[in-house]
Amino acid sequence: DYNREDLAAEKIVRELKKYKVLERTDIIAFSINACLAFKKLMPDGRIFYLNGDLAPRSIKKLGLTGIDYSMSVLRKNPKWVEQAHKEGLEVNVWTVDTEEDMRYFIDLGVDYITTDYPERLQARLK
């Protein structure tokens, strides 16, 4: 099934190759179909799923790099961080802006934190 997500992925990968940044680019998408379209085009690429409706085991079976879920999803499913790591997946959480939330997700063991306040986060990491 070829669709607009396949077409978009092809165009994006073409541009990333053109500018020689494909190997340095992480792909994130809310659509699992888009993630799979990128996976076909870049089998060794770093692809993260954003939507938050799939458990880590499902993401692993699809061959993706990891989960990139909102704070609310990971607060509802905190065990997903440990499960993801056991599956060899990476975990990002977004958008974490309060010091309390930063501490919570640092303690939870996420690999990456997306924030609008990087200086706040860096202070928490020291």
Label each PLM-derived region with a short phrase.
Residues 1-126:
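Short loop-to-alpha-helix "cap/lid" segments that border enzyme active sites
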